Every structure is written in structure tokens, then in C-alpha cells.
């Protein structure tokens, strides 16, 4: 029983390390993925497409996702390229 509990703890720790990224989904243009005119479930669906566990439309402007893999590109103010072309 002790080994099983230890196994579960290790499993959850690995899951937290592997998929711990959260942030705004970014489109191909470098901008946040807009959700202003989308249905309520749009962001949750978009987040699950990139293997995130959940997401919502933050202030009705942009999709924010939780627990995404590290390979997913997210919008960051420091590296913002939105509106500057490719």
C-alpha cells in the first residue's frame, strides 16, 4: 500500500511538471486569440485542442488556458509581436 501511495505521488508530481503552463492562447499573427464574438464554450474548446485542461474568455476579450504542455505558444507582453507583421 505504501508503494502505491508513493507511485501516485510521483505520478501527480510528474504531471504537474510536464503540463504546468498557463496563459493567453496566441494566434498565428502573434496576437491573443480573441473570443469577443464567440460562443461561451469557444475558449474551453480551443484550450482542449492544445491539450489544456480548461480555459475561459478573460474579460470577454481573449482566451486564457490552464495546464497546457510547454510546446504551446502563449502570448507574452515581453515578446509581443501583435500588429507588427511577421
Curated annotation (Swiss-Prot):
Chain ranges of the LCN-type CS-alpha/beta domain: 21-83
The signal peptide here is 1-20
Task: Kindly name one Pfam family recorded for this protein.
Answer: Toxin_3
InterPro entries this protein is in? LCN-type_CS_alpha_beta_dom, Scorpion_toxin-like, Scorpion_toxin-like_sf, Scorpion_toxinL, Scorpion_toxinL/defensin
UniProt-listed Gene3D superfamilies:
Knottin, scorpion toxin-like
Q: What is the tissue specificity?
A: Expressed by the venom gland.
Q: Which residues carry this modification: Arginine amide?
A: 84
Q: Coiled-coil region(s) at which residues?
A: none
Q: Which keywords label this protein?
A: Amidation, Disulfide bond, Ion channel impairing toxin, Neurotoxin, Secreted, Signal, Toxin, Voltage-gated sodium channel impairing toxin
> GO:BP terms for this protein?
defense response
Question: What are the annotated disulfide bridges?
Answer: 31-82, 35-57, 43-63, 47-65
Q: What is its main location?
A: secreted
Entries under SMART domains matching the protein: Knot1 (SM00505)
| Localization | Secreted
Where is it found, in Gene Ontology cellular component terms?
extracellular region
* Family recorded in the similarity comment: Belongs to the long (4 C-C) scorpion toxin superfamily. Sodium channel inhibitor family. Beta subfamily.
Q: What does the UniProt function comment say about this protein?
A: Beta toxins bind voltage-independently at site-4 of sodium channels (Nav) and shift the voltage of activation toward more negative potentials thereby affecting sodium channel activation and promoting spontaneous and repetitive firing.
Q: What is known of its domains?
A: Has the structural arrangement of an alpha-helix connected to antiparallel beta-sheets by disulfide bonds (CS-alpha/beta).
- From the Swiss-Prot or TrEMBL record, give the protein name: Toxin Td2
Q: Which organism is it from?
A: Tityus discrepans
